[in-house]
Amino acid sequence: MNPQIRNPMERMYRDTFYDNFENEPILYGRSYTWLCYEVKIKRGRSNLLWDTGVFRGPVLPKRQSNHRQEVYFRFENHAEMCFLSWFCGNRLPANRRFQITWFVSWNPCLPCVVKVTKFLAEHPNVTLTISAARLYYYRDRDWRWVLLRLHKAGARVKIMDYEDFAYCWENFVCNEGQPFMPWYKFDDNYASLHRTLKEILRNPMEAMYPHIFYFHFKNLLKACGRNESWLCFTMEVTKHHSAVFRKRGVFRNQVDPETHCHAERCFLSWFCDDILSPNTNYEVTWYTSWSPCPECAGEVAEFLARHSNVNLTIFTARLCYFWDTDYQEGLCSLSQEGASVKIMGYKDFVSCWKNFVYSDDEPFKPWKGLQTNFRLLKRRLREILQ
């Protein structure tokens, strides 16, 4: 690979930033992706800055009559691929946890997403947040699927807001001491793209990848670095005590600076908008990586109080801040409104693995301490609810 492409730049010129990061939803003539990255190493509760830089690459492979241009436009020279090649080439230790943030002018293409998905699966010690200035061909079904695949792979996908642009301007642009100046319709463009991405990601996923399940559903008593919640659900429409319709899926936190939408809220929003009918009875089961926070527990309890036709059972892998009285009261409020709250045991993990994980027919492999932690968490939950 060309070393001039593989090695990052420190900054870009002001005109380059304004021209390539303009957040107009439909924009022509920008055939390059610019990627500003920030890599941090997690150490305890602190994130230590490790490196920053800028990559540039073509949006899509193109045929060029000039051989040198043809080489440059190859897929491996996309900005995302340049970053992965550079990052993996540093031979970083597997026992370190890395937090990567990309600020990109365009969201990644499908071939890049395939590589990013594989990279995340092979590096469970890495988390990736992608803040995009624009969405590439977002009206096309295949490109919407690209965003869903990133989301499903565990990457956090969001639209760049004012704070993101100002941060990029300060850290990745030769700004000569000048402040970032938003352009005409900046806020309107952000709102439009934000709504579009939220709509794309609002529907449940079919399943998750094995490395995500093993990382996020491991029933540790102290689970550092699990900063988001995953929720697997089954929903049955019942008539005369028999199921006549079934649906299942997976939700995860949406990275939303306005609402910080937890997985429970994602489910309620989807369920109320697309499914709920007052004359139908529902049996809903959740398998969650974390028990609900006080705010989500309160919303779910209020929902159950208003909808007596919904019966909810919650199996949780871990108890979130179980020593905190607000979290304890949240669990109690769920129980008081009729929700059955339980700790996930071995059979529940196996059931999740079979129904919500792309397992390729591989069996579930229990981790050391699963049964011991289950008993401890079960006893703790019983003490909270009694």
Curated annotation (Swiss-Prot):
Q: Which residues form the CMP/dCMP-type deaminase domain?
A: 29-145, 187-334
Describe, from its UniProt entry, the tissues in which this protein is expressed: Expressed in lymphoid organs. Also detected in non-lymphoid tissues including lung.
Q: Which GO terms describe its cellular component?
A: cytoplasm; nucleus; P-body
Q: Which UniProt keywords apply?
A: Antiviral defense, Cytoplasm, Hydrolase, Immunity, Innate immunity, Metal-binding, Repeat, Zinc
Q: Which residues form the active site?
A: E264 (proton donor)
Organism domain of life:
Eukaryota
GO BP annotations of the record are: clearance of foreign intracellular DNA; cytidine to uridine editing; defense response to virus; DNA cytosine deamination; innate immune response; negative regulation of single stranded viral RNA replication via double stranded DNA intermediate
Concerning Gene3D superfamilies, the annotation shows: Cytidine Deaminase, domain 2
Which cofactors does it use?
A: Zn(2+)
GO molecular-function term, one example from the UniProt record? zinc ion binding
Read off the SUPFAM superfamilies from this record: Cytidine deaminase-like
Indicate the enzyme's highest-level EC class: hydrolase
Query: At which positions is Zn(2+) 1 bound?
Result: H78, C109, C112
Under Enzyme Commission nomenclature, its number is: 3.5.4.38
- Effect annotated for changing D140K: About two-third loss of anti HIV-1 activity
Indicate how activity is controlled.
(Microbial infection) Antiviral activity is neutralized by the HIV-1 virion infectivity factor (Vif), that prevents its incorporation into progeny virions by both inhibiting its translation and/or by inducing its ubiquitination and subsequent degradation by the 26S proteasome.
- Residues reported in the UniProt entry to bind Zn(2+) 2: H262, C293, C296
What additional remark is attached to this entry? Answer: It is one of seven related genes or pseudogenes found in a cluster, thought to result from gene duplication, on chromosome 22.
> What does the record say about domains?
The CMP/dCMP deaminase domain 1 mediates RNA binding, RNA-dependent oligomerization and virion incorporation whereas the CMP/dCMP deaminase domain 2 confers deoxycytidine deaminase activity and substrate sequence specificity.
Q: What does this protein do?
A: DNA deaminase (cytidine deaminase) which acts as an inhibitor of retrovirus replication and retrotransposon mobility via deaminase-dependent and -independent mechanisms. Exhibits antiviral activity against HIV-1. After the penetration of retroviral nucleocapsids into target cells of infection and the initiation of reverse transcription, it can induce the conversion of cytosine to uracil in the minus-sense single-strand viral DNA, leading to G-to-A hypermutations in the subsequent plus-strand viral DNA.
Family in the record? Belongs to the cytidine and deoxycytidylate deaminase family.
How does it associate, per the subunit comment?
Answer: Can form homo- and heterodimers with APOBEC3F and APOBEC3G. Interacts with L1RE1; this interaction inhibits LINE-1 retrotransposition. (Microbial infection) Interacts with HIV-1 Vif. This interaction triggers APOBEC3D polyubiquitylation and degradation by the 26S proteasome.
Please report the name of this protein according to its UniProt entry.
DNA dC->dU-editing enzyme APOBEC-3D
- Gene this protein is translated from: APOBEC3D
